[in-house]
Amino acid sequence: MKQFDLSFYQGKKVFVTGHTGFKGSWLCKVLANAGAIVTGYSLNPPTSPSLFEIADIAQDVHSVIGDIRDYATLKATFDAAQPEIVLHLAAQPIVRDSYKNPAYTYETNVMGTVNILECVRNSNCVKSFLNVTTDKVYLNKEWAWGYRENEELDGFDPYSNSKSCSELVTHLSLIHISEPTRLALIS
């Protein structure tokens, strides 16, 4: 297994949305162990017990419980953190739930992305933004190999479609707010 040199993150201020979820918890643990100064912003953990609780992530990061749809609280938390790196994982990730409540899914996955990108746009501290989505953003062609980033976006269900929209919002921000000398936006 390849070993990664994580020394780059030593002392870096990193803002992680969705830090109480499974992926976000592991990401925060790795970043904290690498010496990053991590601020997490998320809803309460979705299960109890959760990895976030079991691994005691709150001890490793500045944990803020908040809703990505609440721009005022998000912005206040973001401004206080003054991050150099933003890793956006916050989402409504359950396909079945997206059918039951599509409005909430779109509000969280699309407008939540808009909200965090507005925080980035209105700051001078961020150098890198990563929007973590899913392979479900691509048109499902039922083939045996994995999808590539140049595949056609689609979204057959509200979850997948909302994550495709999130990709498009990030792409638009790349065109309109990204300054090559200051900020890299990646989705």
Residue ranges, per PLM feature:
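N-terminal Rossmann-like NAD(P)+-binding domain of SDR-like oxidoreductases, especially those catalyzing
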Residues: M1-S178
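Single conserved hydrophobic/aromatic residue that forms the stacking wall/gate
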Residues: I175-S187
